């Protein structure tokens, strides 16, 4: 019984991830993400328009969300892997 209880406690701690860590995508692939450093608690997706039909997309972690402009669309969010 004690072994079962101990196992449940360990599984709970691992699943809850007691340390605060935001996880943000850094590629278009949903399985590839990075754990954000302390202080960067938002995910960002920036779409930069280079030519009429060519775009660069940057994904990652950020502390303060910048504003969008005519050539840059910015999406910030504050849940794990929300910057798809």
Curated annotation (Swiss-Prot):
Bilayer-spanning residue ranges: none
InterPro entries linked to this entry: Cytotoxin_Cobra (IPR003572), Snake_3FTx (IPR003571), Snake_toxin-like_sf (IPR045860), Snake_toxin_con_site (IPR018354), Toxin_cobra-type (IPR054131)
Example GO molecular function: toxin activity
Main location per the UniProt record: secreted
Disulfide cross-links: 24-43, 36-61, 65-76, 77-82
Keyword Disulfide bond in record: yes
PROSITE patterns: SNAKE_TOXIN
Subcellular location: Secreted
Signal peptide: 1-21
Keywords: Cardiotoxin, Disulfide bond, G-protein coupled receptor impairing toxin, Secreted, Signal, Toxin
Entry's Gene Ontology cellular component terms: extracellular region
Expression sites (tissue/organ): Expressed by the venom gland.
Extra remark beyond the main annotation: Negative results: does not affect blood coagulation and does not show significant hemolytic activity.
Family per record: Belongs to the three-finger toxin family. Short-chain subfamily. Aminergic toxin sub-subfamily.
Role summary: Acts as a beta-blocker by binding to beta-1 and beta-2 adrenergic receptors (ADRB1 and ADRB2). It dose-dependently decreases the heart rate (bradycardia), whereas conventional cardiotoxins increases it. At 100 mg/kg, intraperitoneal injection into mice provokes labored breathing, impaired locomotion, lack of response to external stimuli, and death (after 30 minutes).
Name of the protein described by the UniProt record: Beta-cardiotoxin CTX15
Gene source species: Ophiophagus hannah (King cobra)
């Amino acid at each position: 019984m004690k072994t079962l209880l101990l196992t449940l406690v360990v599984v709970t701690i691992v699943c809850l991830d007691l340390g605060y860590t935001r996880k943000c995508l850094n590629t278009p692939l949903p399985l590839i993400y990075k754990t954000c450093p302390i202080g960067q608690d938002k995910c960002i997706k920036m779409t930069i328009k280079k030519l009429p039909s060519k775009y660069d997309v940057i994904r990652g972690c950020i502390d303060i969300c910048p504003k969008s402009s005519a050539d840059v669309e910015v999406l910030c969010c504050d849940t794990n892997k929300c910057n798809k």
